[in-house]
Amino acid sequence: GSNLRGVCYVLDEPTIGLHPRDNRLLIDTLRDLSGRGNTVVVVEHDEETIREAGHVIDLGPGAGLHGGRVVAEGTPESLAANPESVTGRLLAHPLRHPQRPRRAVAGEAEPGAPAWLHVEGVHRHNLDGLDVALPLGRLVCVTGVSGSGKSTLVRDVLYEGLARLLAQRPERGGEAKEGVAREGAAGVRPSSATRLRPRRRTGGAATEAAVLAGLCASIQGWGEVARVLEVDQTPIGKTPRSCPATYVGVWDTIRKLFAGTPEARMRGYGPGRFSFNVAGGRCEACEGQGVRKLEMSFLPDVEVPCEVCGGARFNAETLAVRYRGLTVSEVLALPVEEALEVFAAHPAVRHALALLQDVGLGYLTLGQRSPTLSGGEAQRLKLVTELARARPGEPTRPGVSAPVEAASGQRGRSSPHTLYLLDEPTVGLHMADVEKLVRVLHRLVDVGHTVVVVEHNLDVVAEADWVVDLGPEGGDGGGRVVAEGPPETVARVRRGSHTARFLKGFLRERGVQAGGRGKPG
């Protein structure tokens, strides 16, 4: 409502968390500000916003070491004609959907139908008596305008309800099962069900109604799920000691490789010598962190490279040992894509590094400090760690553990059927990164898991096997299911669903014919 002119407005990803309907309203507001004689500078990944801009500056061409320069600038049309611009390529040739054949979701009474999870009688915030069914072993998207109850359903009810039920599940030994973890807590690594953080146990068996009190009346079909895991964009660690190599589980193997070199054996060094977390081989001046923190009175603390090791983390004696011509410090400085070549002969390391490369994180260095990772990078690291546990070609069945190949390359651990919950995972992701994220989600489902995503991004919604749209509005005007089914079915809904209206045009433009199966029988 301001009539100011000559103002420079700077906005950093203002479309975060907005439904396509609200996104259109935001763009109209920005155009109005610009039309009044103001300058509007927006940092944005949203395709619609980029297409509406009068001038676009594209940085890249890649991420990390491969970026940092202006590769194109001008109108969106000129960007689309620039072969060096990844953004321009996706403007000229948007993603087509579905990228892979959609998994069939038959009704429960039909042969070959997947197991279903029924959440009944939800009473939470604006959800009043809601009943919803989700197919297991599928990629499920929960959509709706802001405030329609999506996060309440998925995080407050589905996650919390399954967490309580799984904590009550008896093991063979009679104890409650530890099958719950809210991934995203700093330093918490995805792991097998027996290593996950347990919920507080109640004294004795409780009825399901008592366990779910305050959430919903019942959750049917939860016995098919062995684990529930929320994967968010919070940092994987808050100290320089945490890095991609330690998080995905390859650093122990790399340390053993260094300990097995002739020089290390001659000096009597074991794997512990090449750890920056324990005394012996690390630089004691910085305790293996490579930096020292200077406390500034009345100012934020400042980190500077260690003056003793110069940021190498290890002492001179440890750095005298080389593996394929590289010191342990130089290995930590290797980008994933280069480390793949160095450790190509070691399946234990190659498998996890190849997954990092596949999801677009090949530019990260093995020793990059976790606090410097973006939210999207941290989230993909967590998903890669989960993928590294699942052996390709041997999918799980709901409720059944399948043999897997761990990051160590050894077979024998089990991959329990896991329900992954992600709340708007595309926040902060470029269109090219969204494509990579979708591939990761599909791979998790391909090995037998279930992925439930709260999302506004239509590139993700169009890839789902099943969509549940809440609404029709936010707050008191929402809280009910207005459409459900495969994306093509939801797109045919004519009334009550804002998502259907935008999804219909999106699917028409991206080469998908309207048509699909209906609601389960």
Residue ranges and their predicted role:
Residues 1-521:
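Conserved phosphate-binding elements of NTP-dependent enzyme cores
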